[in-house]
Amino acid sequence: MIKVGIVGGTGYTGVELLRILASHPQAEVTVITSRAEAGRQVSELFPNLRGHYDLAFSEPSKEVLLECDVIFFATPHGVAQAMMAELIEGGARVIDLSADFRIRDIATWEKWYGQKHGCPDLVASAVYGLPEVNREKIKSAQLIACPGCYPTSIQLGFLPLLEKGLIDVSSLIANSASGTTGAGKQASVPNLFSEASDSFKAYGAAGHRHLPEIEQGLVDIGGEHANGLSLTFVPHLLPTIRGIHSTLYAKLKGDAGDLQALYEQRYANEPFVDVLPKGDFPQTRTVKSTNMCRISVIEPQERGTVVIMSVIDNLTKGASGQGVQNMNIMFGLDENMGMSSPAILP
């Protein structure tokens, strides 16, 4: 059994991680930390996990965490940096669900996250944990920077076109919408039920901190085809709990051929990417609580603009599920181990 440690397991990504690992046949959570909830039973804070965990939150301890085979950080941005150097020096394998090690340019990270980076020396060695791109690197990685939710949906949507150099990268557009859990568990007025329900709005249109991560990832995917890449990214708030829907737009360079076949062939062997039949369009409810990304692609009226629609669950493929997918790869397991259940409908 893989001994799993979780640092900061009281938020939405933490409980999602616990939910997934509760049914994982080759993993066992042996330690979960929280300074605020130390001594409290996991099942007391999360009653849905009663009968699945006989485990209490504890104060973070480097010595205890180093006894684990893998450590997940489900902490707010900026927290993992404080412990990471000691854990890596101690030989730990770490999967960080926060943004601390995603962006390679330190000055860019500090600008968008509004704080000094506490562990810049490890950023270059972190592997960006998007399995559809970096599977081989993930296998031997010691530190995984798990992608953000919007970046996952957008990169998977554009990926086949970028790899083949079929689109004009100078004016990409991503129009994305997320459920309220994308903002985390901390209370805020915009996320109150009476504020978010029965409404739909854009936010962060002048600049969202996922933008540099997305552009970095798209450039990595496109390589020589991504020179001069620029993305206009506008996120929106959905009146739902979970889910992300991204609608992506790009100008085709010329006759791109059969776009449906391109996507189907690229993702044919990806266990967590489902290319829908031509004419079908993805719905967020079809991926709820799953690690699946569902995609459709179309060139409306054949006017030279390609439109891609990509949906994920922001807490699963957009965070904790993708983290477990990375863990499975790191330990040579089937990628879908512990995550084969379909979405709940209705």
From Swiss-Prot:
GO biological process, any: L-arginine biosynthetic process
Main localization (coarse): cytoplasm
One Gene Ontology cellular component: cytoplasm
Record GO terms (molecular function): N-acetyl-gamma-glutamyl-phosphate reductase activity; NAD binding; NADP+ binding
InterPro entries on file: AGPR_AS (IPR023013), AGPR_type-1 (IPR000706), NAD(P)-bd_dom_sf (IPR036291), NAGSA_dehydrogenase (IPR050085), Semialdehyde_DH_NAD-bd (IPR000534)
Gene3D superfamilies in alphabetical order: Dihydrodipicolinate Reductase, domain 2 (3.30.360.10), NAD(P)-binding Rossmann-like Domain (3.40.50.720)
Catalysed reactions listed for this entry: N-acetyl-L-glutamate 5-semialdehyde + phosphate + NADP(+) = N-acetyl-L-glutamyl 5-phosphate + NADPH + H(+)
Residues forming coiled coils: none
Alphabetized SMART domains for the sequence: Semialdhyde_dh (SM00859)
Domain of life: Bacteria
Localisation: Cytoplasm
Residues the record marks as active site: C149
Protein's job: Catalyzes the NADPH-dependent reduction of N-acetyl-5-glutamyl phosphate to yield N-acetyl-L-glutamate 5-semialdehyde.
Family membership noted in the UniProt record: Belongs to the NAGSA dehydrogenase family. Type 1 subfamily.
Classification via NCBIfam families: argC
Name of the molecule in the record: N-acetyl-gamma-glutamyl-phosphate reductase
Organism: Saccharophagus degradans (strain 2-40 / ATCC 43961 / DSM 17024)
